[in-house]
Structures are given as structure tokens and as C-alpha cells.
A protein has these predicted regions:
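Active-site beta-loop-alpha junctions enriched in small/polar residues
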Residues: 1, 27-29, 72-76, 157-160
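Aromatic-lined substrate-binding rim segments of carbohydrate-active enzymes
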Residues: 11, 28-72
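Mature catalytic domains of secreted/periplasmic carbohydrate-active enzymes
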Residues: 17, 23, 32-39, 111, ...
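Hydrophobic faces of well-ordered beta-strands that scaffold small-molecule active sites
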Residues: 22-24, 67-71, 153-156
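Active-site-proximal loop/short-helix segments
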Residues: 77, 83-85, 130, 147-182
Length: 182
């Protein structure tokens, strides 16, 4: 989903193999493989004016293919280096990132964990307990449904990182506010 040629090959493969539906990832690591008002474009897309999803949909539909989009929901970043997009949520909304500790979040320290494959660290997640996170995600979903002729919306990583997470300071404060006796 980074250039016309790769999309054309994908559609051709689907047609040759008699697919009737395709599922394409449009949000991987807090970035977009489409033009978005809320999500920075993936740095893998070299032509900044290219909208992969807008290119894909009419070509796929012309071949009788239904197009479903797949989004990594709470997983925000899984590389050991910071994203280059200055408007990426890691840079603009650090307070939305979930944590497994009540200590201040050390993003670079967390990203270094991704270099160690055996520790189970998948990456940085948005906090499901932070209401602004969910408002943002709903805007992203709505944008896709309203702006693109898609046939389905598939949500992946719609969970906490693991059972030790959920310690985003805002989430804890909000929990305490509504559960003062616990």
C-alpha cells in the first residue's frame, strides 16, 4: 500500500486467485496509508500526494473485489526508533500513552525494549482508559467510513498491551475519581 505498482500487483493477485474480498492495513503504527486529517501519513509512502486507499478502492471494485480496511487500534508504535512524522501522537500526545508503571513514562527506554525479542514487548500502546484516546480513535474510524467507499472496518490490537498495563496517570486519576472508596 505504498505505491501504485504494489497496489496493482495486489489486486492482480487477488483476481487471479479468485478472491472476492481484500483486507488492507490502513493504520499500522499510529500512521496512515490514506489521506487523513487526524493521522500522519506513513513514512513508507514516498509520494506525499499519493492516497493509497483512494487509488485502491475504485480499481478493486472495478474487478469485483470488496475492500475492508484493517487498523491497529491501540498499538501506537513498535519500532525501536522514534517516528519521523512530527505530528505523530508519540510526539504530540505523550499523555495518551499507556504504561505498566506509575513512574513518569520514558519513551526512549520503552522503545529500547522492542530490540529484545524475548521480553514480549510489542511496542507503545495508547491508553484505552484515557477518554481522549477513544474520542480520537472514533474520529479516525468515522473519517474512513465517511470518506472512503469501504465494505468493512476491522479493528486489531483493541486491548491493553498485557495485564500489567493500564497505569496511564489520567486513567488512574479518572478511576479514583469515580471509585473513591476503592
Amino acid at each position: 500500500m505504498v505505491a501504485e505498482e504494489s497496489i496493482d500487483r495486489m489486486i492482480e493477485y487477488a483476481v487471479i486467485n479468485r478472491f472476492n474480498n481484500i483486507v488492507v492495513q490502513v493504520r499500522g503504527r499510529g500512521d496512515a496509508f490514506y489521506n487523513s486529517a487526524f493521522v500522519p501519513k506513513s513514512s513508507l509512502i514516498k509520494n506525499v500526494d499519493f492516497d493509497p486507499l483512494a487509488y485502491l478502492i475504485p480499481k478493486a471494485k472495478q474487478k469485483g473485489l470488496k475492500v475492508h480496511v484493517w487498523l491497529n487500534t491501540y498499538l501506537l508504535w513498535s519500532s525501536s526508533v522514534m517516528p519521523i512524522q512530527k505530528d505523530h501522537l508519540i510526539h504530540t500526545r505523550k499523555d495518551w500513552i499507556d504504561s505498566n508503571t506509575t513512574s513518569p513514562l520514558n519513551i526512549m527506554g520503552e522503545l529500547k525494549k522492542s530490540r529484545i525479542k524475548s521480553n514480549g514487548f510489542e511496542g507503545l500502546y495508547l491508553s484505552p482508559g484515557h477518554p481522549n484516546v477513544n474520542k480520537h480513535l472514533l474520529k479516525v474510524f468515522k473519517e474512513l467510513v465517511e470518506n472512503y467507499d469501504i465494505d468493512g472496518l476491522h479493528l486489531d490490537y483493541i486491548r491493553f498491551h498485557d495485564s500489567g498495563y493500564g497505569k496511564n496517570p489520567y486513567s488512574i486519576a479518572n478511576y479514583r475519581k469515580f471509585n473513591a472508596s476503592t
